[in-house]
Each structure stands twice: as C-alpha cells, then as structure tokens.
C-alpha cells in the first residue's frame, strides 16, 4: 500500500509512483488515495467488489504502545525478538508474543470446536505445509496432506499391480502395520506413535472415500505452489459434508519475501502469484456456493523499513495484511495507516522508518474467532492477552472487518476474566 504521502521526498524511499499503482475505488482511512502494486490486479478486483479488506499497521503486541516515548521507556512489555524471523513467525501463529509458546491460535480454536465435526479421527486443522505451530492445540494437532491429494494417492502407496505377487505383498504390508499400531505399548513414545498412527489410518480411509466425490471445477487454479495449495483446499471444501466437517482451518505457506536486495524484481515476481491464487480461490468458493462461509487471511512475521538499504528493505515491525471472503466488510482499509515519514513521527522507532503496530494480532484474531463461532466466554483461552486491548461488547467488534449478520452472540455471553501470562 502507498498513500499520497509516500510520494513526497522520494530520495530514500521505496515507493511506486502514483502512475504505477493500481488504484482503489473507496477508502475508510484518513488519507485520500491508496493503491497496490500492478501485479495485484486480482486483489484490486476483489477489493473493489467488496470481497477483500486490508488491515493497516498490524503486528505482535503484548500491550498497547502509544508512541516512541513509551517504547523507549522500558515500562512496556515487548514481544520477544521483534526483528527475528523465527520469533515473529511463531508469535504471529500463537499471538502470545511474550513467550515462545508451542500452541497456536488455530489450535486453541480447534480445541474448543473440533467436537462439532462428525469424524473425530480427522482433525479440523488441515495443513498443506506440514507441521506448524498455528494449528497445534492442547488436544488437537494438524492433519497434513499434499496439494496433489486425490482418492488414489491418500494413505499407503500400494506396490504396483505389475509386480509379481503385488496383492499378497500389499496385504502383508497392511497387516504388518495393523499389528504394529494395535500393540499395547507401555513406553510413552511408542504408545503416542501408535495412537497417532491409528488415527491417521482411520482418517485416510475416510478421506479416500470422500475424495472420490470431488466435483469438476470451472475455476482454473494457477500452476504455482500457492495456486495448487489453494486448489487442493477448494477440493477438500467440496467434500466437507462427506468428511462431516462443520468447522475447518487450513494452513498454507509461501516464502521468498525477505528482500534485503532485489526488492523491485522480487515483488514483481511474487505478488502476481499471490493475487492470481487468491482470486482463483475466492472464485472457487463462489462456485461451491460457500463464499460467505470461507474467510481467507494472510499473516507474516513483520513489515519492512520504508527506506532503502540501497538494494532492498530491512526488518521492521507493524505491517499490512489482507482478509478475503463473502462475509468480509470489504472495499475498506481498517486500522491506522501510519504517516510515511521518518521524522517527527511518534509511531516511528527507527531512522529507517519502522512503525509501532496500531492494531494487535489479538484484536485481529478476536474478530475472526467470533465470526468462526468461538464464544466470547472462550476468547481468553484462545487469546490470553486480549483483555489488554479489547473488552467484548456485541455492538463494538474488535476491529469491524467481519460481517456478523446471522450470528447469535449477545451481551449476555460475556467473556471470562482474562489471565495474561
């Protein structure tokens, strides 16, 4: 995103010119002109159609920090490793930035809501990116699949039929596995592995049958890794009833954004992939008739400095994110877009242009959690720091980017006392 202010004093900055930007039709922020990179034409279309919103200057926070003076005072709790990739990736997934927690936001929601699904062997958290913190709960973990998942490749890969005695060999393999996982182990690690294996075997049998019913799509997904990941999610959404799924959380990743150099070329290559894949995924949810039941959002580790290092941009803090779906109050920019200046700017904490977040991940996630069906009573379990930023009221949502029409939440359903740790 760039505002008109970003085009002033260009010598040290990294903007596109206003002529290069792809503009938006309306705004809800103080500035009068916003636009996106020309490679984000699909994102622009989604925004202008009211199906996508931006969240400006969001980041990990333990408690609100009003300005640079409070940041420097030493009186405010700060996230661990603000400029560390590994720390901030973890903290965006947990929303507990004062500790290196192994339980994520999506995992805690699944702890509460997984029981609503019919087949308990199949986790409501499905990952296209393997093991991750975001989907790890106290009781629920992710079920990892590949983006080429279909009825013929889920579960064990059989010995090819042209092998001699292939049928016998496959039967022996399955019976051996059954024997191993059904053994009553006393060793805790063996017992845990056996239980996990049993659950996985039961899950892929249900998956195998359900995947036979995936319909043909008219929506064409890009061949990029993100496009194929989101295409796989669309196929899994199409068999949600066969899987007995009333709630699901999917997780994908896309790297390559640490652009200390080649920033212009890197964005020109990477952003169209994001735009095309997200547009195709939204179109697929429309095709399935579930656009208002699926919300897609992006998370990262941190933003980048607004001034150049000569070749690119370096680690910063508050940044921007996107939310997409039929239930999103789209065509708007939420949060507080910072003044694009490194001087006389109370939210800037570096001569390079590094902004204190105006919106916390807790507020962002609280809005998503309430829309998803988490009771206000349970918000403190899902987001332990939330009371530092927000007190629940049905007429005052955490941020405002979700449409809660049709929800049954009321002021009588008040949250428990939040315990910050």
Question: Model regions: which residues?
Answer:
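Feature for exported/extracytoplasmic and membrane-associated proteins, marking the mature portion
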Residues: 1-276, 280-287, 307, 332-421
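Metal-dependent active-site segment of extracytoplasmic phospho-/sulfohydrolases and closely related
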Residues: 278, 285-310
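Active-site lining segments that contact anionic ligands and/or coordinate catalytic metals
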Residues: 247-249, 291, 299, 316-319
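Histidine-centered active-site microenvironments of extracellular/periplasmic hydrolases
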Residues: 300-332
